Structure formats: C-alpha cells, structure tokens
Amino acid sequence: MSINKNIARLRRAKSTRAHIRELGVARLSVLRTGQHLYAQVFTADGSKVIAAANTLQADVKDGLKNGKNSDAAVKVGKLIAERAKAAGIEKVAFDRSGYRYHGRIKALADAAREGGLQF
C-alpha cells in the first residue's frame, strides 16, 4: 500500500469516527491486514474495548486454511456479535476504518448482523 493510499484511508476513517462519536453509540471497528482481520467493539466515547475478536484466536483458526479470506471474516463477525451481545451491546455503529465496504469487510459486517448486532 502506498503512503498516499494509506493517508487517504486514514483521512476517511477519521471523518467517519468523528461522525460516530456524535451519534453516541458503541463502535464496531475493523482492522484489515494482509494476513489477518481484527474487530473490536468500543464504548460510545471510545475509551474502553468491550469485546474483541480476530483471526489469530484459536477458536477462529480452527478449520480455516488461513485468516485472510472471507470465510475467516465470517467467523470473526459471528464471534464479535456473540461477545458484544454477552457484554450487553445490541446496537453499534460500523466503523470500516476507511476500507471499502467490499470483500472481507462486507463479509464481517453481514455475519455480525446475522449474529444479532444492529447497525
């Protein structure tokens, strides 16, 4: 990823996070790397992580060839929804961190919705 492309992604993410902060709801944030996918649910003010899931965890790794495809994203999405609901969070704002809503990001979001989270 070139520097300019990454800076543009971070600029989009900053704008989105400012809007989510005004809404005052919990935030489901996603980080995508070349090999793995991470998801975290933050409090409304962003000061505390309520739930987290990623492709490095043993319960997600089981049965997956690698952590960089849509199948892994679906597992992470279902797991983050389960953990957020266990913590009492039903409604979240989806922070895609400046990534396009496509591929792994979309798969994670759809799986989290199926798991019971409302965006």
From Swiss-Prot:
InterPro entries: Ribosomal_uL18_bac-type, Ribosomal_uL18_bac/euk. Keywords: Ribonucleoprotein, Ribosomal protein, RNA-binding, rRNA-binding. Pfam families: Ribosomal_L18p. The keyword Ribosomal protein applies. One of its GO terms (biological process) is translation. The keyword RNA-binding applies. Gene3D superfamilies: 3.30.420.100. One of its GO terms (cellular component) is cytosolic large ribosomal subunit. GO terms for molecular function: 5S rRNA binding; structural constituent of ribosome. CDD domains: Ribosomal_L18_L5e. Part of the 50S ribosomal subunit; part of the 5S rRNA/L5/L18/L25 subcomplex. Contacts the 5S and 23S rRNAs. Belongs to the universal ribosomal protein uL18 family. This is Large ribosomal subunit protein uL18. The gene is rplR.
